[in-house]
Amino acid sequence: AEKICIFFYEDGSRGRDVLTHFLGDAELKSIMTDGYNAYVFIGDELKSAQFKDTIHQVCMSHANNKFVKAANQGGEPNAVLFSNDLKEFFIREHLYDDAGLTSEERLRQRQSLKTKEIVIRVRSRLDAELAKEPEFRSQYYTEALHYLNHFWNELFAFLDDGELPIDNNLAERC
């Protein structure tokens, strides 16, 4: 399938008004963001009539990068475990791409027992880490954990639809 990348920049701002003006009355299946505060409202304010069915996704690469930073700069060994698990999703997505899977076939793979095992492992580890005293974690690790927890549904929305991407790297690399 042909992939489309749109880069939009207006008056030096990434604010809400820029996004809502740009989107106008477009009908979108999904929109992916990086968790930037101005875009968090997508789940609420943009759920007007034309956006009520729009799926808000958050880029998995951004989540993974937070754990990489927590491991490398924060010295958090458990951050590596999260990063390795999140990378499993990327590995699986590359395999689906290489196999030329249709969106229906991709969805079946995303719904597989192996995928569910990874999700359960990540969620269990996340809950266990969040239950620990925060003063014993680095700032980077705390940020990564809270990001993953806060955007859990948006990060894993791709698992429920074979057409949705796992990340917005295509747009990031334009």
Label the model's feature ranges:
Residues A1-C174:
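Catalytic center-proximal scaffold of phosphoryl-transfer enzymes
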